[in-house]
Structures are given as C-alpha cells and as structure tokens.
Amino acid sequence: MVQEFVDASVRAIEAGLDGVELHAANGFLIDQFTRDSINQRDDKYGGTVDNRLRFMLEVVDAVCAAIGAGKVGIRLSPTNNVWGIKDSDPGNTFVRAVERLNTFNLAYVHILETKPDFESPEESKDYLTPLLREKYQGNLLINGGFDQLTGNDALENNEADAIAFGRPFISNPDLVERFQYEKPLTEANSTTFYTHHAEGYTDYPTMDMSR
C-alpha cells in the first residue's frame, strides 16, 4: 500500500507537477489508521499513538525518498469528524503527529480545522491549530472557512504561513484576482460537488474587469 502512494507521487512529478500533498485527513485511508475510533488493530499499526501514526510516517518517508521532501506536503484534519471517524484525544494524537513530521523537513503541513467563535469557550478549547502551530517547526498552512479578511488577519497574527482556499476556488477560477481587486465572489453550488459531469467544474465565469 505504501508503494502505491510512492508510485502516484512519482507519476505526478513526471507529469510536471511541482509537488504532491498526502491526504491524511477527512477520514480517508491514512486518517483511518491515525484515529482510535476506527483503528482497532492489535499489531504494530494499532493501539498506541505512535503505532497508529506508523502508516502515515511510512508513507511520508517513502514518498520523500522518492521525490524529495521539499516536494511533499501533508494534510491533517484533527477535529474534523466525518463518517463517525474521530479520535478520543485529538490533541495528544495530532501534536505527536506534527512532532514526528518535524523530522522530514516537508514543504508544509496543511491543517483543516474551522476556526471557532472565540466568544464561545466551549468551541475555542477544542481548536488545536494554535497548539499545532507552536509544535510544528516548518511551514504551516491552514484551511477552514476563511475569507480574504479573516485569512489576512490570521497571517498578520502569525497563525500560519499561508491560508488555503478550497470552495471559493471552485466557483471563482480567478480567486486570486478577485482578492487582489477586492471583487465580490461567486457562491459555489454545493449540489454539483462530487459529481461526474462538467457542471460545477468548468462553467463558473471569471469576473468582468470592466465593471
């Protein structure tokens, strides 16, 4: 299984991409090894935090060896519980994860976590990004409901080295220019997400610069 990640990464570089992002978030395979609600293994890949991180680290190590650590990023979603997949102690698990990832000198670690309303102590205590920022020594990207204003605020407050945008890019192929010229954004149609047709993928217009 590790070799499949390597093969895909090598093909991506051969195709001309600048790098790859390992998807260790959102309940997909690597995330399933990481979280104790679904990882019930009793071998070296289950049980302790380090055992549950073993598969992730094997993948990272192998891909870095194949294409170079500077071309590898990884995405984590510490508190994004999807499909019932969660962790009993995400703080401990994901702090340990970024501590172990420090040894690889990756291009970046990408954290998906919605920033809470800090007027709500209950919500803010579960927000792990500040702690992960403290523990991770490399470039940190964050993602989770940011817009241009809140993204700039996060950068000014040194919460991350960069902000990643997902949904806004779906419906705004010229998102960078819209931010640059402070133009309104087109709202994405979520009913076209994860479909097999062109609608929602290629039909969002760019802005009219004459307006």
Annotate each PLM feature.
Residues M1-R211:
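Flavin-dependent oxidoreductase catalytic cores
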